[in-house]
Amino acid sequence: MDKKSARIRRAARARHMMREQGVIRLVIHRTSRHIYAQVIAPNGSEVLATASTVEKAISEQVKYTGNKDAAAVVGKIVAERALEKGIKSVAFDRSGFKYHGRVQSLADAAREAGLQF
């Protein structure tokens, strides 16, 4: 089993548990240059809020889009957009990535902005 398939397997296991609980998820995806965050409905069919470093407004705020500072900006913005729609509590779906570095930075910024998980 290679590194990518192990990550996908971890993500599938976590998503299965969240689907059984029926909670709103804050899903992140990380690449070497960008980070993406989406708030997804419990049934998985609707994206309620989203933010990523690909957006022009966010990429203009940061010097480089693939670091912890950019992840913190994305976390803050996705939390603000979720709170605007009345979403206060979510389950954090890290998509099998380690809770470290940019993933941790995004989560901490979302918590500081008022999102609970």
Curated annotation (Swiss-Prot):
InterPro entries in alphabetical order: Ribosomal_uL18_bac-type, Ribosomal_uL18_bac/euk
A GO term for molecular function: structural constituent of ribosome
The keyword Disulfide bond is annotated on this UniProt entry: no
Coiled coil: none
Alphabetic keyword roster: Ribonucleoprotein, Ribosomal protein, RNA-binding, rRNA-binding
GO biological process terms held by the UniProt record: translation
Classification via Pfam families: Ribosomal_L18p
This protein's GO CC annotations: cytosolic large ribosomal subunit
Ribosomal protein found in the keyword field: yes
Position of the signal peptide: none
Residues annotated as transmembrane: none
HAMAP family found in the cross-reference section: Ribosomal_uL18_B
Family: Belongs to the universal ribosomal protein uL18 family.
Subunit text: Part of the 50S ribosomal subunit; part of the 5S rRNA/L5/L18/L25 subcomplex. Contacts the 5S and 23S rRNAs.
Function: This is one of the proteins that bind and probably mediate the attachment of the 5S RNA into the large ribosomal subunit, where it forms part of the central protuberance.
Protein name (Swiss-Prot/TrEMBL): Large ribosomal subunit protein uL18
Protein source organism: Histophilus somni (strain 2336)
Organism lineage string: Bacteria, Pseudomonadati, Pseudomonadota, Gammaproteobacteria, Pasteurellales
